[in-house]
Amino acid sequence: MTLNLDDAKITAEVLTTALPYIQRFVDKLIVVKYGGNAMTDPALESSFARDIVLLKTVGMHPVVVHGGGPQVDNLLKELGRHSDRIDGMRVTDKSTMDIVEMVLGGSVNKSIVSLINKHGGCAIGLTGKDANLILAKKLMMEKIGTDGVAVPVDLGFVGDVVSVNKDVINMLIASDFIPVIAPLGVDEEGNTYNINADLVAGKVAEFLQAEKLMLLTNIKGVLGRDGEVVTGLTPKTVDSLIEDGTISGGMIPKIQCALDAVRSGVKSAVIVDGRVPHATLLEIFTNEGVGTLISRDLDLRSN
C-alpha cells in the first residue's frame, strides 16, 4: 500500500481541528432526538449510528430519543386502519395505542439499537414504561371553536411528561451503554401513552441537566424573514420571533421544547438539519453547525 501524504495530512488536520470540541464535551451528556428523513434513508441511518458511536468513543455520553410516526402510519395503512390528527397530534384510541407501542417500542427501537451496535457501540433499547422511566399523564388539549371559545379535545392515549427517572439513564451511562428511548410513557394507573418525541427528548435533557439537546428535523433550522437560517438565538429573541410571526406553524412546538429545556438548565439546544450526512458530528465539532442554536450564551457558536 502506498502512503498518500497529502491525504494523511488532511486527515490529521481534521482530527486536530476536532480536538477542542472533544475537550469541551468530554464526559458531557448529549441528548439527541432522532427522527425525520434520517430514519428512512439508509445512508443517513448509517451515518447517524456512526456519529453516535464516535461521540461515545471520544468520551461523550449520547442518549437517543427517537420518533417513528411514518412507520406507525405505514403499519396502520397495511392493517386498513385510519388515524386522525388534530393540530398535528395523532388521535390514539386503545387499539391504535397497541399498534403505536408495537412499532415504536419494538421494530423501530430495536432497529436503531442494532444499527448502533453494528457500528461498534453498545446500545440498549428502552421505552418510558421500563422501570417507570417516563411518568406520564393524559395530555389536555383545547381547540378554539368557530365562536372563539376554547373547547376541550380528547386525543385519547396521548400523553405529557410528568417526570423522568434519571437514575435509570445514569446507571446505563455509568455502565457504558448508549440508551435508546422510545417515546412512550406510563401513568400511575399503568396506562400507556404516546408522547411527542421532541417533548420526551426535551424533558430527558432537562431532568438529566444535559450539556446539549439536539433535535434532528427535515428542515434547515429556524428561518428568518429573509429565508436564511438563523444560526443562533437567545430565549428572549425566540419569544420575539414567535410573537411577530417569524416562527410559526409546526416549528412552534419544536422550538418550544428547545426553549423550555434551555430555560430549565440545559446549556444549549439546537434544531439540526437531519438530512445532512453526519449532521450530529457537524453540529458538535464545528463552530457553524448545521442548524439553529438556542442558548443564553451565543458565544458557543464562535468559540
UniProtKB/Swiss-Prot annotation:
The record marks 33, 254 as: Transition state stabilizer. GO terms for cellular component: cytoplasm. Pathway: Amino-acid biosynthesis; L-arginine biosynthesis; N(2)-acetyl-L-ornithine from L-glutamate: step 2/4. Keywords: Amino-acid biosynthesis, Arginine biosynthesis, ATP-binding, Cytoplasm, Kinase, Nucleotide-binding, Transferase. Its main location: cytoplasm. GO terms for molecular function: acetylglutamate kinase activity; ATP binding. It is found in: Cytoplasm. InterPro entries: AceGlu_kinase-like_sf, AcgluKinase_fam, ArgB, Asp/Glu/Uridylate_kinase, Glu/AcGlu_kinase, NAGK-C. Belongs to the acetylglutamate kinase family. ArgB subfamily. Catalyzes the ATP-dependent phosphorylation of N-acetyl-L-glutamate. NCBIfam families: argB (TIGR00761). This is Acetylglutamate kinase. It comes from Psychrobacter arcticus (strain DSM 17307 / VKM B-2377 / 273-4).
